[in-house]
């Protein structure tokens, strides 16, 4: 059996017959199945195999249901790696990207993925991004785009600005560099205009994992509270403070300002201590990450008057946990009932006053903050009220005195889309000294990147130094002007590509007719790491496209699967150099050694496959040794799609052996003339039950369970004492059920045995009959003695423990192993095993 040869044969047949090419058929139910498209980094890896195979199984299954299936692939091709490769290899980024796309396309075809390749898109093509430039200008017209100077996340290695979502634990998401903070003029899109809609829209996404929705809710960060005016002592000015817990107002010990609050420059006396604090915040920023690492604060010369009791004065401090771009950039601190405030009070030796008591336990607020609800104390006229009652009473009182206003705030910030790099979509703006920022006229689009004379030095943006491209005439006054040299954040391209797949050759950004048929995406698949970047941006851009009448949907993805990662152990030699798995071998004692010098290697923990640690598996080698169907089956077996998968040679070899068994059994059936029409009721029941369960498993994306059920049916077929017509029919049903998982071999076996001319991929899904499933079904239970498998026992499904135990203790093989020893206990797992402890 030459699996690779079989796979190439069927891939050619599918391509020649355009099996997966689709068009809109209005009277046919559509299904749009889509994986997150990849960055063409060079080669596909086994992580890609898992993601795309999960998607492919669903697409093939939906096709077998008679649905019209759109399943497409493209390339998220802009980004820094191409620019870095251009610098290292002295080439143009497009050459590097094109070469990588050619390699990865062939790899994905070799896996047998059912894509409509006629819809392939690549985001670095001007035919793609011309629409993005027009869309940007449309948003500019609608007031959704603006430019301002702002404190930005600066990646010193990649030398570009990163969005907040791209800063992970204070480091650049791609380079890993510690982020710096700089004031730069940037372009922003007003995603905050859609904060409430994006938050409420999550409730409609019933097919999304709760974990992803929770992450987006936290990122949007809605909080309802009140802005309270505190009068500064001795100064004709006030500070507006945002609070979500106004009931704790009488427990306030301080007012905290952001280091860059406007009152700081106006009224705070500059001392060496305050200047040192301001300089530190300016250098390291006040991101949530930095706040979590270390909370710092400093007292100032200012005091405020308590709004509900003028005899109370509170000190004003500066602290890094107050963010100028959230709320008002000021808050009051109640150390007894807020953990963060408690830390600051301890640091500055400020008063800690309890104003809420628990009804359930004793609390000591000097030791730790009590953040729960309870009954108000030490709060004058609020004493005795519940926290809920007190909150509303304080809000009413503050509003009545015109010193408070209820507001809703969001942590979500506007999307900064400017990037100081070459390999991205040019921002279609021209800067003129007389006219300001002028949009490039539509007839002059696309603004294309220069293809010659670009110098990639690794420092700054090459577009700044490309004079023939940069210096142009103003479209309005025709005087000298300069192009915008920043390019779009690459998340812009991936925020609408799913709509382009509906018709990738349309003259419009989105073909309205095709989009009305295909959108939304019915099943989207990708990593959970995109929860608050790509997935949030795509939801936002979809709503903008809806408002601008491009499409008639408000949510892009009906259902979402976030597949787990593929893991592999890491290996290091005696010099702590990383080793590839194929550089390691097992010696006769079961120890791992380096093939090169036979020295022992250090085995690390299971980690996500990465080129830097060399714990990657060569996909081309896997396909060459085992074939695509084996790889597909392995990445789907044993582990649910949403869980991480450990790559193992033993596991993939086990799948290879099973597939060999399938093929050999098919050859056996082909070479025998079957005439026996005897019906085995157990096999009949098992076959129909398998159809039913596998169908439901695929619908619920329990693909590992589906494969387990298929293997169970095969085991029953294989164990039948004599071959019959019924066995062949059950085996052919098994092969049809296996088709989405191992499409090449299943097609080959079907063509060998069915005697029919159709391809499996064109046949409807098998149907079960409930009447057959009610027959009593036998199962095989494993018999273990002290945990070791000793025998097997066939019985009816759901046989009670007492009956199983009584029967197996009478078996000669079991009695032989027990001998004269006492049976201490039996561990019974229904329908699975019984373990006799002696």
From Swiss-Prot:
Top enzyme class: ligase
Protein name in the entry: Leucine--tRNA ligase
Enzyme Commission designation: 6.1.1.4
Keywords for this protein: Aminoacyl-tRNA synthetase, ATP-binding, Cytoplasm, Ligase, Nucleotide-binding, Protein biosynthesis
One Pfam family of this chain: tRNA-synt_1g
GO CC term, one of those recorded: cytoplasm
'HIGH' region (motif): residue ranges: 38-48
Residues reported to bind ATP: 611
Family membership noted in the UniProt record: Belongs to the class-I aminoacyl-tRNA synthetase family.
Native species: Orientia tsutsugamushi (strain Boryong) (Rickettsia tsutsugamushi)
Motif 'KMSKS' region boundaries: 608-612
One MF annotation (Gene Ontology) recorded for this entry: aminoacyl-tRNA deacylase activity
Alphabetical list of SUPFAM superfamilies matching this protein: Anticodon-binding domain of a subclass of class I aminoacyl-tRNA synthetases, Nucleotidylyl transferase, ValRS/IleRS/LeuRS editing domain
């Amino acid at each position: 059996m030459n699996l690779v040869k079989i796979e190439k044969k069927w891939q050619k047949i599918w391509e020649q017959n355009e099996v997966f090419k689709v068009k809109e058929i209005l009277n046919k139910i559509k299904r749009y199945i889509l994986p997150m498209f990849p960055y063409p980094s060079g080669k596909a890896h086994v992580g890609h195999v898992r993601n795309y195979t999960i998607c492919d199984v669903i697409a093939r299954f939906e096709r077998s249901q008679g649905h019209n299936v759109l399943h497409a692939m493209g390339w998220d091709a802009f980004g820094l790696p191409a620019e870095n490769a251009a610098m290292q290899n002295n080439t143009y980024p497009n050459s590097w990207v094109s070469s990588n796309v050619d390699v990865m396309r062939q790899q994905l075809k070799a896996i047998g993925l059912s894509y409509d390749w006629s819809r392939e898109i690549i985001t670095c093509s001007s035919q793609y991004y011309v629409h993005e430039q027009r869309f940007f200008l449309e948003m500019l017209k609608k007031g959704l785009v603006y430019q301002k100077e702002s404190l930005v996340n600066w990646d010193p290695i990649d030398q570009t600005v990163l969005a907040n979502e791209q800063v992970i634990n204070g480091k650049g998401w791609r380079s890993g560099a510690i982020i710096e903070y700089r004031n730069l003029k940037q372009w922003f899109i007003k995603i905050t205009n859609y904060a409430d809609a994006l938050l409420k829209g999550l409730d409609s996404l019933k097919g999304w994992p709760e974990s992803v929705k929770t992450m987006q809710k936290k990122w949007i960060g809605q909080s309802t509270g009140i802005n309270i005016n505190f009068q500064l002592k001795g100064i004709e000015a006030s500070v507006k403070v945002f609070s979500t817990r106004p009931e704790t107002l009488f427990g306030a010990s301080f007012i905290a300002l952001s280091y860059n609050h406007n009152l700081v420059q106006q009224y705070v006396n500059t001392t060496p201590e305050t200047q040192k604090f301001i300089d530190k915040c300016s250098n390291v920023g006040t991101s949530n990450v930095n706040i979590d690492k270390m909370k710092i604060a400093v007292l100032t010369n200012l005091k405020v008057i308590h709004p509900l009791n003028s005899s109370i004065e509170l000190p004003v401090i500066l602290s890094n946990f107050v963010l100028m771009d959230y709320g008002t950039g000021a808050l009051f601190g109640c150390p007894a009932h807020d953990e963060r405030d408690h830390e600051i009070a301890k640091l500055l030796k400020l008063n800690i006053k309890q104003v809420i008591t628990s009804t359930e336990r004793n609390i000591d607020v000097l030791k730790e903050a009590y953040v729960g609800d309870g009954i108000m104390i030490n709060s004058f006229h609020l004493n005795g009220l519940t926290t809920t009652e007190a909150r509303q009473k304080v809000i009413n009182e503050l509003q009545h005195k015109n010193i408070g206003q209820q507001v809703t705030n969001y942590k979500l910030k506007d999307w900064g889309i400017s990037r100081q790099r070459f390999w991205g979509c040019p921002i279609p703006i021209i800067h003129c000294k007389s006219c300001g920022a002028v949009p490039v006229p539509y007839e002059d689009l696309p603004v294309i990147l220069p293809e010659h004379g670009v110098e990639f030095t690794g420092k700054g943006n090459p577009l700044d130094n490309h004079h023939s491209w940069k210096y142009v005439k103003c479209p309005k006054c025709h005087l000298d002007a300069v192009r915008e040299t920043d390019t779009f954040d690459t998340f812009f391209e991936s925020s609408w590509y799913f709509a382009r797949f509906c018709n990738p050759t349309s003259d419009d950004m989105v073909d309205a007719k095709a989009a009305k048929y295909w959108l939304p995406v019915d099943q989207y698949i990708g990593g959970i790491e995109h929860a608050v970047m790509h997935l949030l941006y795509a939801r936002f851009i979809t709503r903008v496209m809806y408002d601008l009448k491009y499409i008639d949907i408000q949510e892009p993805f009906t259902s979402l699967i976030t597949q787990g990662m593929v893991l592999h152990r890491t290996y290091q030699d005696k010099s702590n150099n990383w080793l590839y798995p194929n550089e390691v071998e097992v010696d006769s004692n079961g120890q791992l050694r380096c093939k090169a010098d036979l020295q022992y290697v250090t085995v690390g923990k299971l980690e996500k496959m990465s080129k830097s640690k060399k714990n990657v598996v060569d996909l081309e080698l896997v396909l060459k040794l085992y074939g695509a169907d084996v790889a597909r089956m392995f990445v789907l077996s044993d582990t649910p799609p949403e869980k991480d998968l450990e790559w193992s040679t033993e596991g993939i070899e086990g799948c290879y052996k099973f597939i060999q068994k399938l093929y050999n059994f098919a050859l056996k059936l082909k070479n025998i003339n079957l005439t026996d029409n005897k019906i085995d009721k157990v096999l009949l029941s098992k076959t129909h039950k398998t159809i039913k369960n596998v169908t439901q498993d695929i619908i619920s994306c329990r693909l590992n369970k589906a494969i387990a059920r298929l293997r169970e049916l095969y085991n029953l077929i294989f164990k039948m004492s004599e071959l019959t017509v019924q066995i062949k029919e059950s085996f052919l049903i098994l092969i049809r059920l296996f088709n989405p998982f191992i499409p090449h071999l299943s097609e080959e076996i079907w063509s060998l045995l069915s005697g029919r001319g159709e391809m499996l991929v064109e046949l409807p899904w098998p149907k079960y009959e409930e009447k057959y499933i009610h027959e009593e079904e036998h199962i095989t239970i494993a018999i273990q003695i002290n945990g070791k498998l000793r025998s097997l026992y066939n019985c009816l499904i759901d046989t009670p423990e007492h009956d199983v135990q009584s029967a197996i203790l009478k078996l000669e093989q079991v009695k032989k192993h027990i001998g004269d020893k006492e049976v201490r206990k039996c561990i019974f797992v229904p329908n699975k095993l019984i373990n006799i402890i002696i």
